[in-house]
Amino acid sequence: MKVQIMSSAVAVRSFPAREGKPATHFREQTAAVLREGDFPLPFTIGLDEDQPPYGEGFYIIDPKSLQNNKFGGLEFGRRIRLIPDLTAKLQQQPAKVG
């Protein structure tokens, strides 16, 4: 599944401490799944506290991001990880004229 990151900007959502629980902070980045013949599907991808944001470019979803649900179906795990799409870089390079 191909994903595009258009900005390395990170949004932080915070929830204050309450009922004896510490404050919670979520770091998120906007991405989009590219669907052939259809519009891109935007979604947010959670980042770990010390994780640098993904740079602008094309990625694929790491298969380690998938897991089985309790019915044996396939679903995304808690954290989606991206791997740089090296084929996108090759397709963007101009052909050499020789």
Swiss-Prot record:
InterPro entries: NA-bd_OB-fold, Phage_M13_G5P_DNA-bd. One of its GO terms (molecular function) is single-stranded DNA binding. It comes from the Viruses. Gene3D superfamilies: Nucleic acid-binding proteins. The keyword DNA-binding applies. Keywords: DNA replication, DNA-binding. One of its GO terms (biological process) is DNA replication. SUPFAM superfamilies: Nucleic acid-binding proteins. Binds to DNA in a highly cooperative manner without pronounced sequence specificity. During synthesis of the single-stranded (progeny) viral DNA, prevents the conversion into the double-stranded replicative form. G5P is displaced by the capsid protein G8P during phage assembly on the inner bacterial membrane. Homodimer. Belongs to the inovirus G5P protein family. This is DNA-Binding protein G5P.
